[in-house]
């Protein structure tokens, strides 16, 4: 909860930071001085300009060897096609990953954070970022890969997704607790109403009045719920503000089930598995976003497929 409050306060202090985009070859205006400042903008979303390599199906929700093999297939397919890679913007937040086309600004993909089971900066193709997520249409697992300008960018995106997942998990925990409290209160309220009906011969109008009073009390409650009748199973609800300066998200049953199932596959249910080593994580955390756009010391960068 302390992490949520801290992130919320940081976002209020600097909401404009979330509008910036990294990896776009100088499109940004001013970047945070360190990774901590960047991390604080997650609630609204961080933008990364990448190139989409493609997607392939995988059999398991996580694994370094599994993702490496999937990325190898994706890269081989992209090379064989001979087509220019699609330039995209990746927006990462605790809600998930939103993928849009840079030229048309058209939405390509909107993946709930609760469906993502793994992300990595590939070791063989060191400028590739990839994530594995459960399809919103069925239970198949998809590996999506993206070409970054350099390895440090791929590491930064991976770290951002992992951090977004951590915040989202805390939202989920709070949401579950609040839902249990509401269900318990609702059950107790129903028991009281039933007892009144048993002992008092009331008219239907009196029962209706009692229901209206219950609705008024519900409307005054600090938590507002999201309808579970949504037609989009991957539509991630907006966080609802609570009187205690906390944030709660309501999940539909489909997302809740998917998140719970994927949690069983993780090494630690509270942490998104990544392909980053402890050294990689430390290096990425020490980076300034300004460094992400600097050319590598090896010379002029080429961002086409054949520079691997």
From Swiss-Prot:
TM annotation in the entry: none
Motif mapping: Clathrin box: 212-216
Entry text on domains: The [DE]-X(1,2)-F-X-X-[FL]-X-X-X-R motif mediates interaction the AP-2 complex subunit AP2B1. The PID domain mediates interaction with the NPXY internalization motif of LDLR.
Disease linkage: Hypercholesterolemia, familial, 4: A form of hypercholesterolemia, a disorder of lipoprotein metabolism characterized by elevated serum low-density lipoprotein (LDL) cholesterol levels, which result in excess deposition of cholesterol in tissues and leads to xanthelasma, xanthomas, accelerated atherosclerosis and increased risk of premature coronary heart disease. FHCL4 inheritance is autosomal recessive.
One GO term describing the cellular component: cytoplasmic side of plasma membrane
Function summary: Adapter protein (clathrin-associated sorting protein (CLASP)) required for efficient endocytosis of the LDL receptor (LDLR) in polarized cells such as hepatocytes and lymphocytes, but not in non-polarized cells (fibroblasts). May be required for LDL binding and internalization but not for receptor clustering in coated pits. May facilitate the endocytosis of LDLR and LDLR-LDL complexes from coated pits by stabilizing the interaction between the receptor and the structural components of the pits. May also be involved in the internalization of other LDLR family members.
Start and end residues of each stretch annotated as AP-2 complex binding: 249-276
Residues modified as Phosphoserine: 14, 186, 202
Modified residues annotated as N-acetylmethionine in this record: 1
Organism: Homo sapiens
Protein name, per record: Low density lipoprotein receptor adapter protein 1
Ranges where the PID domain occurs: 42-196
Extent of motif [DE]-X(1,2)-F-X-X-[FL]-X-X-X-R motif: 257-266
Molecular function per GO: amyloid-beta binding; AP-1 adaptor complex binding; AP-2 adaptor complex binding; clathrin adaptor activity; clathrin binding; low-density lipoprotein particle receptor binding; phosphatidylinositol-4,5-bisphosphate binding; phosphotyrosine residue binding
One GO BP: positive regulation of receptor-mediated endocytosis involved in cholesterol transport
Annotated SMART domains: PTB
Lineage: Eukaryota, Metazoa, Chordata, Craniata, Vertebrata
Effect of residue 56 to M: Found in patients with hypercholesterolemia; likely pathogenic
Key words, A-Z: Acetylation, Atherosclerosis, Cholesterol metabolism, Cytoplasm, Disease variant, Endocytosis, Hyperlipidemia, Lipid metabolism, Phosphoprotein, Steroid metabolism, Sterol metabolism
Tissue expr: Expressed at high levels in the kidney, liver, and placenta, with lower levels detectable in brain, heart, muscle, colon, spleen, intestine, lung, and leukocytes.
Cystine pairings recorded for this chain: none
Localization: Cytoplasm
Chief location category: cytoplasm
Subunit structure: Interacts (via PID domain) with LDLR (via NPXY motif). Binds to soluble clathrin trimers. Interacts with AP2B1; the interaction mediates the association with the AP-2 complex. Interacts with VLDLR. Interacts with LRP2.
């Amino acid at each position: 909860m302390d992490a949520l409050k801290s992130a919320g306060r940081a976002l209020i202090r600097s909401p404009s930071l979330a509008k910036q985009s990294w990896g776009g070859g100088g499109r940004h205006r001013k970047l945070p001085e360190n990774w901590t400042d960047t991390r604080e903008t997650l609630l609204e979303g961080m933008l990364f300009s990448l190139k989409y390599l493609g997607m392939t199906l995988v059999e398991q929700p996580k694994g370094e060897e599994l993702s490496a093999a999937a990325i190898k297939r994706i890269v081989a397919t992209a090379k064989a096609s001979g087509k220019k890679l699609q330039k995209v913007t990746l927006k990462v937040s605790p809600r998930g990953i939103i993928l849009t086309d840079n030229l048309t600004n058209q939405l390509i993909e909107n993946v709930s954070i609760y469906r993502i089971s793994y992300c990595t900066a590939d070791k063989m193709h060191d400028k590739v970022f990839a994530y594995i997520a459960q399809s919103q249409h069925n239970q198949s697992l998809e590996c999506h890969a993206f070409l970054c300008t350099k390895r440090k960018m791929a590491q930064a995106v991976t770290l951002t997704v992992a951090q977004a997942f951590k915040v989202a998990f805390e939202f989920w925990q709070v949401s579950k607790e609040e839902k249990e409290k509401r269900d318990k209160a609702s059950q107790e309220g129903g028991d009281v109403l039933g007892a009144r009906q048993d002992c008092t011969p009331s008219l239907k109008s009196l029962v209706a009045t009692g229901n209206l009073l219950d609705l008024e009390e519900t409307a005054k409650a600090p938590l507002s719920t999201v309808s579970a009748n949504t037609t989009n199973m991957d539509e991630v609800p907006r966080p609802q503000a609570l009187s205690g300066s906390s944030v709660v998200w309501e999940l539909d049953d489909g997302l809740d089930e998917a998140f719970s199932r994927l949690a069983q596959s993780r090494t630690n249910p509270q942490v998104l598995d990544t392909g980053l080593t402890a050294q990689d994580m430390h290096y990425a955390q020490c980076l300034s976003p300004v460094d992400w756009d600097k050319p590598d010391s090896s010379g002029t960068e080429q961002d086409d497929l054949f520079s691997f």
